């Protein structure tokens, strides 16, 4: 990946995968564009900007003048350019979750809030989104207030759930995700059996889309428990309750799991709803000092209500500012 700096000072990340077996960036772009439509409600999704193709090597660092807009945006066109694609997403100026899992202070004070934010989103969108490759390297940690704590208020609960956390987790890499609304009709029967699809149909992404338990054409409410497997230190007791890979062939256990729609919490964690319940019980108590307030109004789509989240700066001491209040998207 490469950092891109625009003439106006804005920044982005250019993803240029290499090697056989890579995911198809056209599909990742299609998934990202759909998820962009949910970012005003669920801030855990990274902003997807553009997908490009190039004819020859881009160089190192890449020459942006060699990139061309990849249109039309469909799987067929994605096949034709599979080995020469680049994806531009918004930059997150923060570490990955993986790099923080050895930090005892993070484990004690922030991990519960980070995981709650992720699994709240996964639970609320359990019929619309499954990541299918959710692990700690695919979570980036953003802080829009310079590393200071923020108060998170989730108003879907009565009374609202409140906790303080220093990070807004951003889910990245949608190349194997199920996202409701993407048209994949004829992907296997037509697109991946055409000469234009080679080598993509065998090496660059589309063949990974239809495993026994991993299918980007449908949701799986258990698949994204992978993130909770083998958590360190004081979180090991929660990981021990996670059932991931149960009744799945050993060689596939690392990547996929059988779906369990009926929850088993508190005895076991078998789906994202169980995970949310377990994480709710681990949230830290509210603190008095925070630099900003996140109000999350996201609710399941079935009830017809989805309010935009709000981000408001706070006064010193953790109270809401009476002046210069502003709401913005992060």
Where in this protein do the model-derived segments appear?
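Catalytic activation segment of kinase domains across protein kinase-like and atypical kinase folds
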Residues: 135-219
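Conserved structural core of kinase catalytic domains
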Residues: 43-108
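Helical subdomain adjoining the active site within ATP-dependent kinase catalytic cores
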Residues: 186, 197-316
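Arg/Lys-rich, intrinsically disordered low-complexity tails that mediate electrostatic binding
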Residues: 314-330
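Short coil/turn segments at secondary-structure boundaries
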Residues: 15-17, 60-64, 100-104, 182-187, ...
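Eukaryotic short linear interaction motifs
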Residues: 11, 21-24, 55-60, 95-98, ...
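ATP-binding glycine-rich loop module of kinase domains
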Residues: 1-56
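Conserved kinase catalytic-core helix
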Residues: 103-132, 136-137, 142-146
